[in-house]
Amino acid sequence: MTVFSALLLAGVLSALALAVGGAVGMRLTSRVVEQRQRVATEWSGITVSQMLQCIVTLMPLGAAVVDTHRDVVYLNERAKELGLVRDRQLDDQAWRAARQALGGEDVEFDLSPRKRSATGRSGLSVHGHARLLSEEDRRFAVVFVHDQSDYARMEAARRDFVANVSHELKTPVGAMALLAEALLASADDSETVRRFAEKVLIEANRLGDMVAELIELSRLQGAERLPNMTDVDVDTIVSEAISRHKVAADNADIEVRTDAPSNLRVLGDQTLLVTALANLVSNAIAYSPRGSLVSISRRRRGANIEIAVTDRGIGIAPEDQERVFERFFRGDKARSRATGGSGLGLAIVKHVAANHDGTIRVWSKPGTGSTFTLALPALIEAYHDDERPEQAREPELRSNRSQREEELSR
């Protein structure tokens, strides 16, 4: 190949390379242009400024910008809801924090209680933070506030719980300490030792029951799903709950009466359901006069199975009926302590019901008695209308007479 031919070939190859490169470059350039046009089209509906405005408006924090004269130059709706700004006036505590922020400090504060109540939302716990808006322009401070009410309520509940547990544990522990001292002082008297030892055992059992109930309540209040959900026979639940307290009923000469077997079924944790119903039976026995009747009934009502426990006891005052399911709540404290209960039984019932997507409700009249009704979703079974068992048709055949009246009339 001559030098001329070689140069000619090199020139052709170079030309081809340039042509291909140009084509590719044009294609890439057109793609970039198309992409930019598409992005521009997508953003044409909202500007960055509008987007930021939407974010500030919708965020759960209250925000306000204030100048050195206490004039509020910007705020979002949440700032008014939380009491940071009212009638364009910054909260007193917030303004004190803002003045420090204008001096270059970052300040945390709590809103004034007076301002929070003025918003009509009592019980709010609002925490705030103030800082300089910009180092370049020191005329403005920005103040943020957020609602800490849930956290404050949780902390209050935790403190109450610790205080209640400490108080409840102090009684059996103190009793056991005194009994132990008495035992040491009576070591030579076998009869006295035996009597005090029996009392120590009673207090130890009470303490053990309380700890077990605390553990159970803690587990029920957790977020985990119940692990042992099975097809549960309601009649079995009733029988086991009664058997747990047969001795206590016999000792108090109380008859525990039930209606006929129902063949009703629910989906649930059998152990927890028995525990819940047993707690209701235990309460009914404990608060009933000697020689009275405690009755248990079960029925299907719509999509639910209802198990009702009725006593003819002292009843519950109307002002206490909403609180009986709280931990450690006792209406008649003297009577409650005499029964030896921990004050946790009904709280456990409430959480067992909630974990089964059910409910627990109470009807009571002082001097007449009480009915606690545990309602649980019925087990769904595929029956044709003409093949449903008698129990499934019960709501259609049963009279409208209330279950409570039926139980109390027995």
Swiss-Prot record:
Superkingdom per UniProt: Bacteria
Region (Disordered): 385-410
One Pfam family from the record: HisKA
Localization: Cell membrane
Description of the deletion phenotype: The senX3-regX3 deletion mutant shows a growth defect after infection of macrophages and is attenuated in both immunodeficient and immunocompetent mice.
GO biological process: cellular detoxification; phosphorelay signal transduction system
EC number: 2.7.13.3
Modified residues (Phosphohistidine): 167
SMART domains: HATPase_c (SM00387), HisKA (SM00388)
Upregulation: Part of the senX3-regX3 operon. The two genes are separated by a rather long intercistronic region composed of a class of duplicated sequences named mycobacterial interspersed repetitive units (MIRUs). Significantly up-regulated after 28 days of hypoxia.
Protein name (record): Sensor-like histidine kinase SenX3
Species name: Mycobacterium tuberculosis (strain ATCC 25618 / H37Rv)
